[in-house]
Amino acid sequence: MQQYSSKYNKQAILLVNLGTPDNYDTKSIKRYLKEFLSDPRVIEANPILWKIILNLIILPIRAKKNIHTYKTVWNKQHNKSPLLFYTENLADKLDKKLDNYIVDYAMRYGNPSIESKIKSLQDQGATEIIIFPLYPQYSATTATVYDEVYRVLSKLRWQPTIKGINPYYDNKFHIQTISQQIKEHLKKLDSTPDTVLFSFHGLPKEYFDKGDPYYCHCYKTYRLVKEELQNEYPNIDFELSFQSRFGPKKWLEPYTTVKLEEFAKQNKSVVIIAPGFSADCLETLEELAISEKENFIKKGGKEFSLIPCLNDSNQHVDMLYNIIDEEICLKK
């Protein structure tokens, strides 16, 4: 990130993504998963019982299991996970576009931490920090970003002003960007697919029952993009699903795996997009692009094509710029 004189640059924008291990070894993965899965916003369970299950069962098994999956998607050229690589580049591009603001990024879990970046921004003279969670749909992962921000602030004698960017699941710039992304992908294909499947990260159904708006936000994103596209593509079915189920509880349905198996049995061709993810990560590059694709083809599916996340594309930079400008009226 660029360094700025504290005399002239007092406002900062902090992009926050979910997080990633520092490397794909057992120790790094276990450390990351422990921080992530210890957050009561993420796992709502008896804290004592969950701590025992997490440390004795979940972490030893999942850390070893995930070595191969992380290694498969790891950006070995830069020795970074794709999520970290794209988020870092995204922040750098937005920083260059916003001359009057300091732009940086942090991860809610893992490194670079929110705490380290708030300190860095203060050292550069930021007296106002705009927090921008890169999750279009609001859920526990959004709330916990602010939990951590205010935990950090509670320890500071000098606290910067904090502002937050709202979830952008139905923002016109977001809907237009996702719609255009799908159009551009469809133009590259040799034939028109039978279905475009919108796959969002899943959530235990009980969270929805308790009032979490995530499902409603996902559905609205899906509906608004569908409305943008269905007149132009009347022969394509647009459908919604949820992936990455974890544990024995019932999660939001329909499950992506189940929907893809249904399409495979019907020998359909499918294009899949994961608009809840701002950058490609394990859930898109391994779970969807490899595991789900292999299962889909094995079960009789015709063609499978995954649309990349917005990542560090210029379209993503422009979209974030417009959303921020709409929310806070950027200084030009």
From Swiss-Prot:
CDD domains per record: Ferrochelatase_C, Ferrochelatase_N
Residues bound to Fe cation: H201, E283
Family recorded in the similarity comment: Belongs to the ferrochelatase family.
Entry's localization field: Cytoplasm
Lineage: Bacteria, Pseudomonadati, Pseudomonadota, Gammaproteobacteria, Thiotrichales
Function, in words: Catalyzes the ferrous insertion into protoporphyrin IX.
Alphabetized UniProt keyword annotations: Cytoplasm, Heme biosynthesis, Iron, Lyase, Metal-binding, Porphyrin biosynthesis
NCBIfam families: hemH
Record has 4Fe-4S as a keyword: no
GO cellular component, one term: cytoplasm
Catalytic activity: heme b + 2 H(+) = protoporphyrin IX + Fe(2+)
Known pathway: Porphyrin-containing compound metabolism; protoheme biosynthesis; protoheme from protoporphyrin-IX: step 1/1
Entry-linked SUPFAM superfamilies: Chelatase (SSF53800)
Record protein name field: Ferrochelatase
